Amino acid sequence: MAVTSAKKNPGSPGIEELISRLEEITRNIENPETGIENSIALYEEGLAIAEQCKKRLQEARKKIEIINPELAKNWPDTARNRDLFDSEI
């Protein structure tokens, strides 16, 4: 069975693409040949992408809570999970 992706905005990148870009940004920042100004610009881009990812994960969690409240009740409510879904980046 083929897996399809439902996006609100077909022109926006999916979470997988966003995470891939974050990984690329990390590699570029870690590269000693990347200058400080470029590293700062990459860092700012990474923060913006991380915020997009966080919002999408929050939306996904809310949908799952509506679709399957029993599943949501069994999620571990650790400090890490609360930080991920409820805090500001």
UniProtKB/Swiss-Prot annotation:
Keywords: Cytoplasm, Exonuclease, Hydrolase, Nuclease. Its main location: cytoplasm. Gene3D superfamilies: Exonuclease VII, small subunit. One of its GO terms (biological process) is DNA catabolic process. It catalyses: Exonucleolytic cleavage in either 5'- to 3'- or 3'- to 5'-direction to yield nucleoside 5'-phosphates. One of its GO terms (cellular component) is cytosol. Pfam families: Exonuc_VII_S (PF02609). Its EC number is 3.1.11.6. InterPro entries: Exonuc_VII_S (IPR003761), Exonuc_VII_ssu_sf (IPR037004). It comes from the Bacteria. Bidirectionally degrades single-stranded DNA into large acid-insoluble oligonucleotides, which are then degraded further into small acid-soluble oligonucleotides. Heterooligomer composed of large and small subunits. This is Exodeoxyribonuclease 7 small subunit.
